């Protein structure tokens, strides 16, 4: 191995640039059901992005192998990966009524510490309105095994985000720019 070869973490994935961010709680942590407040985002990955999907599947497998002792717990054997809860989910099956998830997989990633957020040129994004549910970008995520309160599986941690381009906001609210994009200045008094 050469001196310049990078050590890679088999459980870490950088998604492709066409990943869409939904439920983007990346500026302030939110608590769910009184639990630990966390930063989170749902990453919508087109099924056509087979490279990212393959990297996620390999990272889940690596997290399973690395976490076998944790997954075994007090049991006699490690449960098969196929019976465990894993974070890569099919939007067509689990969110059939949400067009944003059609033809896509999704991964919910979260962290207790704030993710770093940069633009396409790797400059920090500090303006909150620049990052919203609906933008497209890459995400740095890591997979790990968990065994807590009788629940076992593989989870996804959120590391960093890189916004690549704007997208139609998700959540039903149009942006002011799109609402007033027409040149139709009808005189409403006539």
Residues of each region from the PLM?
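OB-fold ssDNA-binding interfaces and closely related basic DNA-contact patches used
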Residues: 1-106
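Acidic, gly/ser/pro-rich intrinsically disordered tails
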Residues: 1-13, 168-190
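Beta-strand elements of well-folded, non-transmembrane domains
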Residues: 45-47, 143-145, 165
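Short intrinsically disordered coil segments
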Residues: 57-62, 122-124, 172-183
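Beta-strand/loop nucleic-acid-binding surfaces
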Residues: 108-126
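Exposed beta-sheet edge/beta-hairpin loop segments within beta-rich domains
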Residues: 120-137, 144-154
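OB-fold/S1-family single-stranded nucleic acid-binding modules
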Residues: 148-168
